Regions:
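Membrane-interface "cap" regions at the ends of multi-pass membrane proteins
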Residues: 1-50, 54, 60-68, 76, ...
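Hydrophobic, membrane-embedded alpha-helices of multi-pass small-molecule transporters
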Residues: 18-36, 56, 64, 184-191, ...
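Extracellular loop-to-transmembrane helix junctions
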Residues: 34-141, 145, 159, 165-174, ...
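Membrane-helix boundary/coupling elements in multi-pass transport proteins
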Residues: 79, 103-121, 267-285, 346-385, ...
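TM-loop-TM module centered on a large, flexible mid-protein loop between adjacent transmembrane helices
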Residues: 82-90, 124-155, 239-252, 295-365, ...
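Hydrophobic alpha-helical segments and their helix-loop junctions in multi-pass secondary transporters
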Residues: 121, 126-128, 212-246, 313-318, ...
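C-terminal membrane-solvent junction of multi-pass transporters and transport-like membrane proteins
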Residues: 177-180, 390-396, 437-487, 507, ...
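Membrane-interface loop-to-helix entry segments
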Residues: 180-240, 296-300, 426-439, 466, ...
Length: 561
């Protein structure tokens, strides 16, 4: 039996002020995550890229039903599936439970820095563009500088703000830069923080307006090209992976090709699974029993449409050669492509730049809302330092938000430096996300065994829970096979980042709480005085963990980049 300790008094608690429609709008930033890696996946996988997005989205949708069920067990918790899943693992390991929460936060919080990096790139392109090779200024420069190339001309005519940097260095093979992109990204991050400071209801209202401005155009660009003849069947043939990433030469369905496809599925999961954030707000729902399922189901349907249509039309319009162009790979040229897809001119492109900035800010607002509540609930439940359990009078977890902000200002120095560092952070973040998904998909059946007597507002069919458990091991394979496609150090760096929870949890649990858990941690499961109850699942959770580790190691060995 675990003794319990009462948490320190809080200024206030999260407020029950929203319903599922508000959560839907808060999660409406998830479809914009397609913009983060649409070029990277196409440049890595080739013509099967659109199928990669569709398959990954199918995985995410099936998994969401497990998360919807376990969220219903905890009407008084916030923070998302990682928090609800952690309660299942607690009986079996004090360390695995906080690992779930930590890895979820590691996955979500970098959205702020990654999104603001791309948005800053859009802003720089609008006000200080790099001249195109056929620009009049370039031609004039070449005429007066004999023997020079268009590359020389572009370098000479590039505005100084594009190359200026207060700090430029390489640390452990990763480029760090404090240039214009960094400082614009800082400004955008502060704007997101200011909006979030008003609480979840105010955030939902802002995101509803921004979401409509973003989602409707994305639907237009996903549908119109089918009717104006801008989707070419030839751009999907031959339907084989690339021989080498970012080179348009077709490869084959051999081990090398499958490695690239699994790498694409790995990084796509970071975007396509992310609508599970809709259940981060259970303790803020007016009617959690109804709102929890409706929120994640409606968000999932929206994501199915966006994540299926947009990659398909992009590829059908551009082809692989267009998809691997630098502007598409780094995300800053997507607006121009969208304008061309619907036949727009300069005005349309300008409006789309604004919409893309709004889309990226929408995704960062979604990320801060969810990740800060994960930190908050992790603190309330005794996983993370007590400092994070404070909320302001609007019901916003401000100390968790400040932690998110500070961490992402540091990440911005990496993500804003170059494309390689951007994808390293993305891959590292996704290692945490896959670990979280593995633990929480298994938490579904553990809760069924250990807490089957607890009423569930919505209960998934047994075969769906079983399918989620199978997908847990599919995700483990994607982790082992796919992470190193994006960076040779990503997999092991991801394990190191995940292990950082050990000193954090040790400090909270043994230093701050004296080895005891807060009394309210398991109140939704009917726990009395912190009793964890019988381990009815026996050794099965340990078998699942061992199996997951084995799958990661074997797939990492078999699918070596």
């Amino acid at each position: 039996m675990d003794a319990v300790v009462r948490p320190e008094p809080q200024t206030t608690e999260l407020h029950r002020t929203i319903d599922w429609k508000d959560a839907f709008w808060v999660a409406s930033g998830v479809p914009a995550l397609v913009l983060f890696s649409i070029g990277g996946i196409a440049g890595t996988v080739g013509n099967p890229a659109c199928a990669v997005w569709a398959v990954s989205m199918l995985f995410g949708f099936v998994q969401s039903f497990t998360y919807a069920e376990i969220a219903g067990l905890f009407p008084n918790k916030s923070g998302g599936a990682s928090v609800y899943g952690a309660a299942a693992w607690l009986k079996y390991s004090k360390l695995i439970a906080p690992l779930s929460v930590w890895c979820n936060w590691l996955a979500w919080t970098p959205v702020l820095s990654l999104g603001c990096t791309i948005a800053a790139g859009y802003i720089l392109n609008a006000f200080a563009p790099i001249p195109a090779a056929d620009a009049p200024a370039v031609q004039q420069w070449l005429a007066t500088h004999g023997g020079k190339t268009a590359v020389d001309a572009a370098a000479a005519l590039t505005p100084g703000i594009r190359t200026w940097s207060m700090l430029d260095m390489t640390l452990i093979g990763v480029h760090i830069s404090l240039g214009a992109t960094f400082f614009i990204g800082v400004a955008l991050t502060l704007i997101v923080f200011a909006i979030q400071h008003r609480g979840i209801l105010g955030t939902a209202r802002v995101q509803m307006v921004v979401g409509l401005l973003v989602i409707i155009p994305m639907l237009v660009f996903g549908i119109v090209p089918f009717f104006n003849g801008h989707v070419s069947q030839a751009n999907f043939s031959p339907f084989v992976p690339l021989a080498t990433p970012y080179a348009a030469a077709p490869g084959a369905w051999n081990r090398s090709g499958w490695t690239l496809v699994l790498g694409g599925l790995f990084i796509a999961a970071w975007s396509t699974y992310a609508f599970e954030t809709a259940i981060c707000y259970t303790s803020e729902f007016k009617n959690p029993g109804r709102d929890t399922f409706n929120a994640i189901f409606s968000s999932g349907l929206l994501c199915i449409v966006i994540f299926t249509l947009v990659p398909f039309t992009f590829q059908g319009f551009l082809g692989v050669k267009g998809m691997i162009s630098p502007g598409v790979v780094d995300g800053t040229g997507v607006a121009a492509v969208m304008a061309d897809m619907v036949g727009g001119g300069a005005l349309t492109k300008g409006l789309l730049v604004l919409l893309m900035v709004l889309a990226l800010l929408l995704s960062t607002m979604t990320a801060m809302a969810g990740s800060s509540r994960t930190l908050y609930q992790g603190s309330v439940d005794g996983w993370l330092p007590r400092y994070l359990s404070h909320v302001n009078t609007h019901g916003a977890p401000t100390r968790a938000m400040w932690t998110d902000l500070t961490f992402n200002l540091m990440l911005l120095s990496l993500t804003s430096s170059d494309t390689a560092s951007f994808y390293f952070v993305l891959a590292l973040s996704n290692c945490g996300y896959i670990i979280f998904n593995f633990l929480n998909l298994n938490a579904g059946w553990i809760h069924r065994i250990d807490n089957g007597h607890i009423a569930r507002p919505w209960k998934a069919p047994a075969f769906v829970i079983a399918a989620g458990a199978v997908l847990a091991f599919v995700n483990a394979m994607l982790l082992g096979a796919g992470a190193r496609v994006w960076n040779p150090h990503a997999l092991w760096a991801g394990f190191v980042a995940a292990a950082l929870i050990i000193p954090v949890f040790w400090f909270r649990h043994y230093v701050q709480d004296g080895g005891r858990f807060p009394a309210r941690m398991l109140e939704d499961l009917g726990s009395v005085d912190g009793q964890l109850g019988e381990r009815r699942a026996g050794v099965l959770p340990y078998v699942a963990l061992a199996g997951g580790v084995l799958v990661v190691l074997v797939s990492a060995w078999v699918f070596r980049p």
